[in-house]
């Protein structure tokens, strides 16, 4: 690990204008030390919104939302082939560093308009979503459906 840290230190010092992102390399393979060099982490290559809700729930116990990248991906999802509404995919991704990894050219005009509105909404609430206090509600694992979250801006 120390060799990796030396490489990260060298990269970030040599190229301070580049935003580097750590990668979990399949999940659960990053540690707090990586955040000393890379300010954000890609938590998992599984971008299916329902799977990702569980992944992000787990990370929320130890990491702030401001460090874990989360993306709205194509539908059907390329890992699970699950078809999930665009709104659901956005709602999950918004509880992280929200991004999109889908071909907008494949979307209908109304979906592209929805993406534009989602990005505007995320920008409006970004301070709360990334830097607010995050409280866990009902667990996503209790068998009663989706978990609940409350976020409030600190200070």
Describe each region flagged by the PLM.
Residues 2-106:
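Glycan-recognition surfaces
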